[in-house]
Amino acid sequence: MSKSHADYIISTVESDHVGTRLTASWRRSMMKHGLDPSRTPAPKRFSDMEIQERRARLEGFMDLATPQLDHLFQMVGNTGCSVLMTDRDGVILDQRSKDADSDTFQDWGLWAGFDWSEKSEGTNGIGTCIAEARSLIIHRDEHFMSRNTVMSCMDAPIFGPDGELIAALDVSSCRADQTEAYTRLISGVVAQTAKQIETEAFRAAFPKARIITGPEERPEGAVLLAVDQDDLIVGATRAARRAFGLGLGGKIDPRPASDILGRDSTSSALERAERAALKRAIARAGGNMSAAARELGIGRATLYRRMKRLGIGENGEN
C-alpha cells in the first residue's frame, strides 16, 4: 500500500496537470525540497536545549495560549485526537493527548521537539498550513509521506500582533474511522481557537490602546485595530491589515483613525464598529454573556462596561 501511495504521488508530481493546492504542495515537497514519499525514518527531533530555546522565544505567547489549548483539548481529547502548537518553523513546542493515545502520537513524531515543516515532512497539516499561511485539512492519504497516511490533521495559522505568522495550531487524529463531517467540524473549532489566541495576543500587545473591532468579519481572523489616546491607529491584526490595506506584516506607522474609518466623525465610526461587533458576538452566543465575552477575548465585566457605554441592553438591543 505504501508503494502504491508513493507511486501515485510521484506520477502526479511528474505529470503536466496543473492540479490543486494539494498537488502543488506535493510538487514542492518533491521538486523543491527533494523528498521521497516512500522514506521511512521518523521526523527529525531537536535537542532538549534547542526546544527550550524555541519555547523561550515565545514564552509570553505560550502562557497566553495555554487556556485556549486546554479548552480545545477538553473538546477533542476523548476522540483519539492530540492538540499541538508549533512555532513558525513547524517545530512542536507543546502537545496534549490522552495517556491511552500518547504512545501512538510519540511513535508518529507528534510530540514536542519534532520538526513538521514542509521541507522536512512534505505535505502535512502543520507544514503546509505554515507554507500557505491558511487553515486546512490534510486527511490520511493526502500526506506526502506514505508513513504519515495513518493520520488526519486539522490546522490553522496563528498570526502575531505585528501581522506575521508566529505559530500553528494543530489537532491530529489517530482514528481510522473518523468521518469527513467530524473532521470538518474539528477544523472549524481549530480555526476559531486560533482566532481567539490571536485576539488575546493582540490585546496584550497594546494594553494602553483602545481596541476596535472592524465593522466586517473576515474568515482569516478578527479585524482589530489598536487606537491610542490621540485617535491614531498604532496596531492592526492580520485580518485588519488586509481589510484596510495596511500591509500584511511589520510595524505600522501611526496614522489617523479617520483616514481608515472615514472622516464623518471618527469617534462615531469607531463606536459603530465596536457596537456592531458586540451585538454580533451576543447574538452568536444566544444571549450568553460569558460565551460572548470569550469570543471577543475580554472578561465578562469588561463586556458589560462596554455594553453600558455603547447603550446596548441585556438582550443585545440598543
Spell out what each predicted region is.
Residues 252-264:
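PAS-family sensory/regulatory domains
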Residues 264-270:
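Dynamic helix-loop-helix/coil hinge segments at AAA+ ATPase domain boundaries and subdomain interfaces
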Residues 126, 248, 255-257:
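N-terminal sensory regulatory modules of PAS/LOV and PAS-like folds
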